[in-house]
């Protein structure tokens, strides 16, 4: 590797080449210093110290000779390491070095010693240096290492030492020193700037003079080398080229002219670029790409409001660079310190070569479209190069930058397949070999490809990076070559490996990804602790095959060596045990999860021989004792790490409806299947307080569309108005009268949101200390507002004064010529013969001892004013009270002339008739009453029209004596106060009592004597609107005056939204068992439909909650609930649902994984969102939220985790660690293994080797397959839906087609076949 080459010092080229290069560099440096100023003056003593450093390279006699000759200014001296010969006498300078641990390595002098630096390599976050010291074993006590952020010095007991100045800064406080077998010393150096690629381990002396210190904001993720300085970057002077020494070492002396020509071209290209005010390098921009045919690749870059005048795309053979400015506020907020004038740059190193001249781009309103023309017609399988070799070390970076923005499922670029990845790696290897051999193979490349990227110095603000800690490796026996190979194979960050869809296996992929982010389960399987607990003799298990297969798959997901991994082995193991998972049909993710965890439990069950146990009832014993006995009985048969981590316990309570026998048992659970509230409907309910002075309040109450009861409304209103539900009455009003009064158990399924519901607060007998009379009250006018212009029976219009129409005296709404017409029309009219009501009816509750006429009238008038408008017109002197009938009024016809047969056939006789005033031309026949128009609400009583005040004669029947007025009084406009109305001699209304036989009787005012009213009667409030009376009132219905409840404003929006608390409440609510689930009562000796209630008793460390979104009514009627269920991401408190023994700390949980389901019952797609919690705190994450969409893995924000598609939730309990079993050998854990078990153990060992060897490249073309299996898929990978809604539409169409086909097969086909046989 080049790291080792660097350790031996620079290889000298021919003297002529060195002199020419040195002169050219000195000349360019002089020009640069005259333009920008001397960098030594700017940085002060730092450069002075570097200039005075004179280390000697080991094994380089020329360097030693140069030092002896006093040549101190040579530009080819390299600060690499500082070894000193062992066994030589210590000089005073060396003694001073041994005393000071942090001495500046710049001032050390070295003598030639054997080579110490063996190799070095780097990952995304750290650099590992390997030193070989001697032959014998090496102890940490013999090593003295001193680190700073820029350099290090390592001394050994034998007198050797090594050190130097690093290419970039490190975290000196986190540096580690470890010893390995074979006298190896490993130095682990965490990078201060993660994801920054180091071209070399140590820096050259001349580089320190021209490269400024690394900025902590320099976080470049992507290509390892910038092949040309672009607009916005400071051009690197040719003399300061950091790779120039390395290039000189690798060149062939015969190719010097070509090399100098390349450097000259690079310098000329660099000086042509002007430096702008600011330039920000972007590690990632939201994008996607796809291959358009065999010759093109289309890239969509999603940036809005781009300034087209200053934006452009630069193309080269192996990369392209987007330079742009944007005014998009959302984009600028992601980059603090940046504004509309900030220039951004995003460079992408491509997977294969392109034709720059044939590439195009265009700007749209919301994105940039880039079309890349391939140099060769071949399938890329991805956009960016997966990895590259820089400085001799293979850099482990993702195929593409880790996205910082969320993308919908299927919106990310396709990953690189394994075969293409292998070809790319071989291409990199051959390219590296060609560069080492000479310039012949390099001459075809562009000159700028040899320029190593210079660290950015003009970053406006720190950019976010993906800080992914590597997965801890277990100690490996033997050499560390295997570990080094895995590091070199890394192509993505740990935890960003997807799973290939083998064919409708998205349900399996989502479950595996969620379980792989369960911290305790991941660590348990990764460090192979589970091997000590494999139960090889369990007939219910797989002999350890499932556990080992799951461990291999889990390790592959966290090694970062695959973009996507095929879970085919695990699927085959599962299918061998459960035949329903054979093939490529769709399955329920929760069903697969339950089987997988149960299979892992059986493979890891610590119980070798399961004893027989029985379920024991409580029999009146304390719950604590019964629960502990049940748990220990369960652990006698089931004891594994899966039980310790996932299983809890709930209390089941059954009550017999006949004998009231109570049975209490305690059962374990692996997950909680919580039901979802049914679809909601919002009902408007008007609440009337007990006292009429409080204005009614309109509430919006959400109830279930099916199986809802009045108790739901009463309970909701009870919480809002703080009144007990038993003191509330709910009634439905239709056409101004009570349609029905609901009991709490009555159903509301037939009530629609357009119906009118009234809720009344009633006085309780406990509060009144006596009997309370509850009365229904309805309102109606004395004279209805129905026009009468013709006979209702013969339809003959009134012709003359002598032929007057007569009204029906019961309803006053129809008229007849005579009694014969009335008798003819009576069968049709009797169902509608009732008075016309106005306003809203209401309920009043009065203590029996205070039920006086004055109190009753006050309550009635107080409630009535909210739904009717009342106006008393001014008094007219010419109007007098009617003492007798009008002279022109005809005598009432008697009903005695009806035939007896008719009376027997119809016990309800037609009422008497009353004359109607003749209708004039154009007269409506209406009494002069303020009638409410049908087209809108009635105006307020403050404005009275002249039509309302007009009066006209009307013929009426004889009036009761109580209705006569003794003297005229001046009328008071507007509504009168109840006290005034009571004191007035003429009331505005009359009160009638209606008994159970529907007979009416007017109530008389008895002063302070209470009225005797039974519970079976109701009241009618009759308004005096007869214009023939001296003091009449104008009355009409109006819209109910009420106040809006502010808390109900968002009830309509929340109708389709539920909370997890509501679901848990439904889970713990008692329910009646269905007939097919009847419980056998041991006391009745019969099956009973008992009531059952489940309550949580013992909570697990990892709580899995399934939202029961699927409902199966029949084969055809199946449904999925897609309503949003709001669940907490942080701090789920289950203390109110757990009735077990209370602990000191509340049972709080944090979400770490979600399985989502898109689509319907027939077709759908599963994805998963997950994060890796910290091992000590579930609130923190070692790896943030990611979206797993089969083989595509992208980062998402935590705010996007809660969606309406969530199906299975994974919660981790706070401050409740699960102790893992100690790792032990199989013989120690199972000392009595028989030959069969030993054979199974040997087979398990072979499984390890077989499954680990299965980590082969993903075959090209694998992906979401059809139901015919992987071998039947040909062609490129199909792209998933861009957004979840698009996927839902696709699955909805497919589901509809499948439902129609099923309907035809089940309904029409049998009919056709039957008719054919007939």
From Swiss-Prot:
Stated membrane topology is: Single-pass membrane protein
Outline the extent of the USP domain.
Answer: 497-1214
> Which top-rank group of organisms is this from?
Eukaryota
List, alphabetically, the Pfam families matched: CS, UCH, USP19_linker, zf-MYND
Q: Which GO terms describe its molecular function?
A: cysteine-type deubiquitinase activity; Hsp90 protein binding; zinc ion binding
Question: Which amino acid positions bind Zn(2+) 1, per UniProt?
Answer: 791, 794, 817, 821
Which residues are Zn(2+) 2-binding?
A: 808, 811, 829, 833
Name the Enzyme Commission number(s) assigned to this protein.
3.4.19.12
User: Which segments does the topology annotation call Cytoplasmic?
Assistant: 1-1291
What catalytic activity does the UniProt entry give for this protein? Answer: Thiol-dependent hydrolysis of ester, thioester, amide, peptide and isopeptide bonds formed by the C-terminal Gly of ubiquitin (a 76-residue protein attached to proteins as an intracellular targeting signal)
BP GO annotations: ERAD pathway; negative regulation of skeletal muscle tissue development; positive regulation of cell cycle process; protein deubiquitination; protein stabilization; regulation of cellular response to hypoxia; regulation of ERAD pathway; regulation of protein stability
Entry-linked PANTHER family: UBIQUITIN CARBOXYL-TERMINAL HYDROLASE (PTHR21646), UBIQUITIN CARBOXYL-TERMINAL HYDROLASE 19 (PTHR21646:SF74)
What UniProt notes about the protein's domains is:
Contains two CS (CHORD and Sgt1) domains, namely CS1 and CS2, in its N-terminus and a catalytic USP domain (USPD).
Recorded protein name is Ubiquitin carboxyl-terminal hydrolase 19
Q: What is the organism field in this record?
A: Homo sapiens
